[in-house]
Structure formats: C-alpha cells, structure tokens
Amino acid sequence: MSATDASTADSGAKRKSSEDITHNCNANFGAENGLRKRVKSEEPVASIKDETNPEVPMKIKAEPVENADEPTSTTPAIKIKAEPADNGNSPAAAMVKTEPTNSNAQDAADESTVSSSSIRTSCRFGIRCYRRNPAHRSAEAHPGDQDYRRPNFPAPPLGTPACPFGNACYRRNPVHFQDYSHPADFNSAQNIRNRLRQRRAQRQNDDDSGTDEEDEPFGGDNDRDADYRPGADINEDEDDELEFDSQPISGDDYD
C-alpha cells in the first residue's frame, strides 16, 4: 500500500469518528430536551380560583369584639369566623362590621312615630275641651298626646255670615267655623301664633308695671277685686303651643 492510500484511509477514519461524535452529541442533547419536556409536562399545574365554592358547607361562628371604650349606645362590631367543615376545606376567615347606630336618636324616633293602627280620634275641641271623664280622655287624643292631630275645619254652609274679625280671627271653636265664613286666604294657625305673641308681650308688660307695687304688698287689692275672673291666672300658652305644633288633619271627620 502506498503512502497516499494510507493518508486517505486515515482522513476517512478521522472524518467518520468526528461524524459519530457529532451524532452522539446531537442524540444526547435531543434526549435531554425530551426528558426536560416530559418532566415539565408531568409537573402538576396549580390552578388559582378566586371564586368560593358554593357547595362547600361553612360553619359561621359569631364572636363579639370586646371594647370597653365603646359607648352603650353603639352596636358592637361582630367578627364572623368561618370554620372548615368535615370535608377538610378551609375557607378564609371573614370580618363583618355592623354600622353603629345611635340608640337615643332611634328611641326618640320610635317614640315620635305612631303607627296608623294606634291613632285615636282627636278631640274636636282640642285644648278647649272641658270634659274630664277618663273614658273620654282615653278614647280621644288631646294636645300633648303623640297621636293628636289638629283639625282643619270644613267650610261652612252657603249663606253663612262672614266672621267680623276676617283674616284676623284667632278663634278655634269648631262651632264658630260652622256659624261664620272666613276668607279663602285665612290662616288660623298664624293668627293664633300672633295672638300668643301679643299675650306674652302683654303679660310681660303687666309684670314690669307690677314691680312698683311690691313695696306695698296690700296696696291696690281692693281695686282689682272687681276685675277678678276665675281661671284668669292659668297660663295657657304652653297648651296652645302644644295644640298648634301638632299635625293638622282633614276636618271632614268633624262634620
């Protein structure tokens, strides 16, 4: 064999060995990639679900929050603790806070609110009612009662004479409103308030003028005996305000 043939054979052997090495490297690399892909595909995927399962039963335990500084008029916050059921699922704990309410304001609203079923018939004479029968007082509401409603008197029959006081009339007797007619823009409540102001001013002036007579306690008693009227010293201002601060109702019930 010549030297040329020997060198050619060596070159072919080296080329073959390098191709084998390259092939083996590619095979190993492909095997490693396949193994990595297989391992990655076999890894469990953790699914995240925000929604709670409605089928999972939950036990709710209410625990009051202890707070000594809280006033008695406010509703304490309630902590709701969700405990896992028998199936082993453990839902997250939830905190539910109730809005505090003012019990004093609520009680005042409850006292001022009267249900329609408990409203009694209002006495048509209001504060001017002279009846002292307990049965009448319990059967009909009077000024000062929560269910008292100030009546709006109906229009008198046609042909009744006009009230001599006109718009300045401050009468409240229902018989007067049946015997006399009043203008269309007549405001009885406003007239009575004006009358109350005049009465207070007159009483204040009388008190101021009577201070000079305090030095003589018995002076002038004989002069006032003729002007004495029973019940004239009774203060009716508060009763009048009770009546006219009440809610008006239709006067058709007083026909």
From Swiss-Prot:
Ranges of biased composition (kind: Low complexity): 1-11
Pfam families, per database record: zf-CCHH
Gene Ontology CC annotations of this record: nucleus
GO molecular function annotation: 3'-5' exonuclease activity; class II DNA-(apurinic or apyrimidinic site) endonuclease activity; zinc ion binding
Domain of life of the native organism: Eukaryota
Record-listed E.C. numbers: 3.1.1.-
Keyword Zinc-finger: yes
InterPro entries: APLF, APLF_PBZ
EC category: hydrolase
Region (Disordered): 1-117, 131-168, 195-255
Biased composition (Acidic residues): 207-218, 234-244
Zn finger residue spans: PBZ-type: 121-142, 161-182
Annotated family: Belongs to the APLF family.
Function: Displays apurinic-apyrimidinic (AP) endonuclease and 3'-5' exonuclease activities in vitro.
The protein's name in its UniProt record: Aprataxin and PNK-like factor
